[in-house]
């Protein structure tokens, strides 16, 4: 039912836009593009909890993400996009389809581009572009669930001169999967700079994560996050570091009746080096303290390393090893994974 509703809504939205624009079938297709992106892997997972094998241990094939996007340009100022997101949900043991993007864009100038609807948020997609290996693993803040990549709201971005850019968003706070209305809006922003091959950025978030609703549970705490990134991106190699510090960054903490605060922080170091036009070595290491106040002994240490193969335009493969270890007093969860990851773009 949810899949049919999402797909039907997307189709109806584009049909209505087509009618409003008054464009002929030929001119409509001339100004419309369809794109796709798939992240998939075939791997073996060895997951243990306090020394005992646990799910999802085993060998298998996964499609982590499948995006289908439709872009239409009405004129030099206005355009629109609808992008669906296919993924597997372990909660219901089934696949689901969401609208990741559904927006109308107005480009007033390079310094001001406004989008209304669901679209990329300021931080995670920016870091993904710098990192370069999203199909292998999420970026630091996304992997640790203190940030997400898209949400519903009002978004603005632009370039300021030759070196600076910005992005800001006033959003519902529940993420793109849940467009529910809330009493107030959350806010996320980023200011970035690029000098030759050096990239620097700072960002932040504040809000109730979509939990502040009329007649709902009280939300005494406010989720906040501060982000920073510095990276060198050259012709053959790149190296960078990402950092975050977050307070009360979960729905449970925002609604905590005891008004108990919790803090988290972490960093990621990543890099890659292109050996030949086809093969590239890459890797990253992360360390996170996910609950510095309530569970100060808890620590998450993660790394991956691999070699990627650019098969042809739009198709890449990577042989990868991953290790993720979460420890606290008396407990240890370890996840080791090895396999082949792929990204397909068109």
Question: In which residue ranges do the predicted regions lie?
Answer:
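Active-site-proximal beta-alpha loop/turn segments in soluble metabolic enzymes
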Residues: 169-178, 207-215
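Short hydrophobic/aromatic segments of transmembrane alpha-helices and their interfaces
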Residues: 7-8, 62, 147, 298-299
């Amino acid at each position: 039912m949810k899949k049919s509703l999402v797909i039907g809504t997307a189709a109806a939205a584009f049909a209505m836009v087509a009618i409003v624009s008054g464009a002929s079938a030929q001119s409509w297709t001339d100004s419309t593009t369809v794109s796709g992106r798939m992240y998939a892997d075939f791997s073996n997972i060895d997951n243990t909890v306090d020394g005992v094998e646990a799910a999802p241990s085993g060998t298998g094939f996964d499609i982590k993400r499948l995006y289908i996007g439709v872009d239409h340009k009405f004129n030099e100022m206005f355009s629109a996009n609808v992008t669906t997101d296919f993924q597997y949900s372990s909660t219901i043991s089934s696949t689901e389809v969401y609208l990741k993007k559904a927006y109308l864009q107005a480009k007033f100038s390079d310094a001001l581009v406004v989008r209304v609807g669901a679209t990329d948020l300021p931080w995670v997609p920016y870091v993904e572009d710098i990192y370069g290996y999203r199909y292998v693993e999420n970026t630091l803040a996304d992997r640790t669930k203190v940030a997400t990549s898209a949400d519903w709201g009002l978004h603005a971005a632009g370039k300021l001169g030759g070196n600076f850019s910005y992005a800001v968003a006033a959003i519902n706070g529940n993420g793109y999967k849940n467009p529910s209305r809330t009493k107030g809006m959350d806010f996320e922003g980023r200011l970035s700079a690029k000098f030759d091959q050096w990239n620097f950025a700072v960002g932040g978030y504040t809000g109730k994560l979509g939990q502040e609703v009329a007649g709902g549970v009280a939300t005494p705490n406010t989720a906040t996050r501060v982000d920073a990134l510095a990276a060198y991106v050259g012709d053959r190699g790149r190296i960078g570091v990402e950092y975050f510090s977050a307070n009360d960054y979960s729905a449970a903490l925002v609604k905590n009746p005891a008004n108990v605060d919790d803090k988290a922080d972490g960093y990621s170091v990543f890099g890659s080096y292109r050996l030949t036009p086809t093969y590239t070595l890459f890797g990253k290491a992360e360390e996170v303290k996910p609950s510095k106040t309530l569970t100060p002994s808890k620590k998450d240490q993660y790394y991956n390393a691999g070699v990627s193969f650019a098969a042809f335009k739009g198709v890449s493969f990577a042989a990868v090893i991953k290790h993720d270890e979460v420890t606290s007093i008396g407990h240890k969860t370890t996840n080791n994974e090895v396999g082949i990851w792929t990204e397909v773009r068109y």
